[in-house]
A protein has these predicted regions:
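Secretory targeting and sorting signals
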Residues: 1-30
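Second-shell loop/turn segments in exported
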Residues: 35-42, 50-58, 123-135, 162-164, ...
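Catalytic glycan-binding domains that act on GlcNAc-containing polysaccharides
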Residues: 36-182, 187-188
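N-terminal catalytic cores of peptidoglycan-degrading enzymes
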Residues: 39-46, 191-311, 381, 510, ...
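SH3/SH3-like (including bacterial SH3b) beta-barrel domains
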Residues: 465-489, 495-498, 554-564, 568-569, ...
Length: 817
């Protein structure tokens, strides 16, 4: 059993925060010091409220409590069960004394007790309560964090305290990054917890460069723990074939092979024993191991060399293997700290070596195909159903399905990408403890990364079968390791039939059915090249390796590697999505310790070509000679109701176009307006205002589908009636200024109009009656105006607009003084 690395051990004599003792679930042993009161936290009705009460009781800032707990557990309490490294509750409190670490990450001896025991001493809560009561665990974790704090104001003063939960700089930085970015999620038991983003939080300094001897991005705590390249025994000759635990190559240079995949594994064991295995020359090696508790990374192999990790030499030749501490049958194993450091590492490797960030090239060990007939049944199934691919690819910056919305609008011939969700996707599983000891029993309601496929469109139908994974079985099962009928998030499928909410898709040589409910669709439309078999009578063979043809070995001294088809076929009438149409057909020869064997350390390339496919649960290969490749096609879409135009058909009026209705759900549209059948340059918005030049002419709009998945089909509206003259709108009425006295002059303001007028005409009014000849902008008052009220009537005009008239308010009666 591994020793968890949780940071500096909690000393029995650690400073306690002085608060009254909680009366409930108290430890029976007495204590001479005062304890943190957990009473309010224990009675909090929600996890959100419990964080607030614990913050009040301990003095730890509530956002910091949430951020630390998120990195340790994503706020899941594991239902009273131990998590990946034996911890309990949202703070992952450990039963064992953790190893102590100093600032240089060098272990040092310390008299220590477990986190559970220390939290019990600080709060008076029993160890059992701290393990099993979520609110008790929150109070205990908060008390521990408070006891680690050495004073100071502000969130930055808590960095050392945070480090004692995670031991590594990565963990501290991740906690503070979480404070900056915020998080909100619903936990496995339905609790909504929200951490509001605070961009004012200062991040701890990032490492400026990775340590020597590691291929990691700056800022990650990586250490070199090299895998040995050694003979089986010292007495063996240099040309011995008995050596381990990897092969030398030039994968990052011109010698090849190329790097095309990153394989995600779990260790099915603890960190320390796993790292020791990678150091055993008689065992096998992979490139990296990532620790669960804090995401710490150990690098074992240089990317140029070939690890022995995938169980498939072709995949080994072309891949980097990353082991994650954990067990595939344990629902709560994979920590947020592990996800984040792993994603940061993978993003770095993918960018450096040109590996696509997609689910066909960043793959699980469970996606690696067998090598020869009968080998598929022996392949691995890690990282298993509890690895959150959706979250992982979000962290990679390459979300599954991109920014497209899941849709129920699917038709035969469509290629779809499955997006399962995770926390909201609790599929039934059985046999977790037996399939992946020492995992506990499968947890009902736990999130999963797959959806089941059925043999007919019904959830009571038998699960789909996989003749390679379970030869002779007529149906898949819910057993934890049985991937026969599991389509995992990111997988691409070709739709053959649609029946209501059910999609009939091609799977392992048969038609299988995926439930895609309209109220919670699980697929996004995508584009992919596809293949169909050339022969109407002979199915295409499916391979687990893209090896060269026999003639390529001639004269090399390298034994021919037989092309052994797998248990699968592609019959006539079936279509599968292509995940890579530019594969290298090669075989890297490596059989002797010193590379002196015939053709050793040579990457032999062939002329035969293969495509990589999505097929059943895995990635497989098919010879191009046996299939036809079809370019990604946009699906057809038709207008069912033409676009319409609404709004006033007049100069200056705003016309609005509706898109009409279409046979498929379309992501968007483009618009083009026409006047008397001629395209109006630049008129490409959903709205259009006819100008003066449009007077008397008819307008129509052409709407074109703007969706990468569908053909760019267009439809036109009916033409409008001829555009009528525009109308003015008075925003501010005319006004008269000046003193209404005989001998004085009044002046007219025309007011404010929309649109602006070109001309304005004036008519002065005396008690509402036009004054003959008074048509200027000013009016001189005479004796005729004595006692009258004077106003002005303004008429505005412009080209293509109907004249408009408005009258000012009248003055007070004209006086002589």
């Amino acid at each position: 059993m591994r020793t968890p690395h949780r940071g500096i051990a909690v000393a029995v004599v650690a400073a306690a925060v002085l608060f009254p003792a909680a009366p409930s679930v108290l430890a029976s042993t007495s204590t001479t010091r005062q304890e943190v009161s957990c009473t309010a936290t224990l009675s909090a009705p929600t996890r959100e409220a419990a964080f607030g009460e614990a913050a009040t009781a301990t003095g730890v800032p509530e956002p910091l409590l949430k951020a630390v707990a998120y990195m340790l557990s994503r706020w899941d309490d594991h239902r009273g069960r131990p998590s990946s490294d034996g911890g309990y509750g949202v703070f992952d409190l450990g039963d064992r004394a953790p190893e102590a670490w100093d600032g240089a990450d060098k272990g040092r001896a310390a008299k220590a007790t477990s986190q559970i025991a220390a939290a019990s001493g600080l709060t008076g809560l029993t160890a059992d309560a701290l393990r099993r009561d979520p609110n008790a665990g929150i109070c205990g974790g908060a008390a521990l964090l408070a006891s680690y704090h050495h004073g100071g104001d502000g969130l930055s003063s808590w960095r050392d305290a945070v480090a004692r939960f995670g031991a590594k700089n990565d963990f501290v930085r991740q906690v503070y990054q979480t404070l900056r970015s915020g998080e909100s999620r619903v936990t496995a038991d339905g609790q909504r917890v929200t951490l509001t983003a605070d961009e004012s939080v200062t991040l701890p300094a990032m490492r400026l460069a990775a340590d020597a001897g590691v291929d990691c991005p700056a800022g990650l705590d990586c250490e070199p723990i090299p895998a040995p390249y050694a003979k089986g025994s010292a007495g063996e000759p240099d040309d011995t074939t008995d050596y381990g635990n990897h092969d030398l190559a030039d994968r990052t240079g011109p010698g090849g092979p190329t790097l095309d995949y990153i394989v995600i594994h779990d260790t099915e064991g603890y960190y320390d024993p796993s790292v020791r295995l990678a150091q055993d020359p008689t065992y096998l090696a992979w490139n990296y191991t990532i620790r669960s508790s804090d995401g710490h990374i150990a690098q074992h192999l240089d990317a140029k060399d070939v690890g022995w990790h995938a169980g498939n030499w072709y995949v080994n030749m072309h891949s980097i293997g990353i082991e994650h501490e954990g067990f595939a049958g344990t629902a709560a194993w994979f920590t947020e700290s592990m996800y984040q450091t792993s994603a940061t590492l993978v993003r770095h490797l993918a960018q450096k070596y040109g590996i696509p960030l997609d689910r066909a090239h960043v793959i699980g060990h469970d996606q690696v195909p067998g090598t020869v007939l009968g080998a598929t049944r022996s392949m691995h199934w890690d990282p298993g159903p509890y690895w959150d691919w959706d979250h992982y690819f979000d962290l990679l910056g390459a979300p599954i399905g991109g920014d497209l919305k899941a849709t129920a609008d699917v038709a035969p011939g469509d290629v779809v990408e499955v997006r399962t969700g995770y926390r909201d996707n609790p599929q039934p599983l059985t046999g977790c403890a037996a399939a992946s000891p020492p995992s506990p029993d499968c947890v009902t309601g736990a999130g999963t990364n797959f959806l089941p496929l059925y043999q007919s469109p019904s959830e009571t139908a038998p699960l789909a079968a996989d003749p390679g994974w379970k030869p002779g079985a007529t149906a898949g099962s819910t057993y934890a390791s049985d991937i026969s009928a599991r389509v995992v998030s990111g997988h691409k499928l070709v739709v053959a039939q649609v029946q209501g909410d059910w999609l009939g898709v091609w799977w392992a040589g048969s038609l299988a059915w995926l439930h895609n409910p309209a109220d919670r669709p699980v697929v996004v439309r995508t584009q992919a090249k596809t293949v169909t078999v050339k022969s109407a009578t002979t199915p295409a063979a499916v391979y687990g390796r893209a090896y060269p043809e026999a003639s390529a070995y001639t004269g090399t001294g390298i034994p021919v590697q037989a092309l052994s088809p797998l248990e699968y076929k592609i019959p006539a009438g079936q279509t599968y999505a292509v995940s890579d149409d530019d594969l290298v057909t090669d075989y890297y020869r490596a059989t002797t310790f010193d590379g002196s064997g015939p053709g050793d350390r040579t990457d032999l390339k062939g002329q035969d070509r293969y495509y990589q496919l999505w097929y059943a649960h895995r990635q497989v290969f098919v010879r191009t000679a046996e299939v036809d490749l079809h370019d990604a096609q946009r699906s057809p879409v038709a207008s069912t109701t033409p676009p319409t135009i609404s709004g006033p058909v007049k100069v200056g009026g705003e016309l609005s176009a509706s898109s009409g209705t279409w046979s498929r759900q379309v992501a968007g549209f483009t618009y083009q307006w026409y006047v008397d059948g001629a395209k109006v340059p630049g008129a490409t918005e959903p709205t259009y205002r006819p100008g003066a030049g449009d007077l008397g002419r008819s307008v129509l709009v052409e709407v074109t589908v703007d969706d990468p998945y569908f053909t760019a089909t267009s439809a036109r509206s009916a033409a409008t009636a001829p555009v009528a003259p525009g109308t003015f709108t008075s925003a501010q009425p005319p006004a008269v200024s000046g003193t209404p006295k005989i001998g004085r002059t009044l002046k007219a303001s025309p007011g404010t109009w929309t649109p602006s007028f070109e001309k304005a005409a004036y008519q002065w009014l005396r008690d509402g009656v036009p004054v003959r000849g008074a048509t200027g902008r000013t009016y001189h008052l005479t004796g005729h105006d004595r006692g009258a009220r004077v106003a002005v009537r303004v008429t505005v005009s412009a080209k293509a607009y109907a004249k408009a008239v408005a009258t000012s308010a009248a003055t007070r009666p004209v006086t002589t003084h």
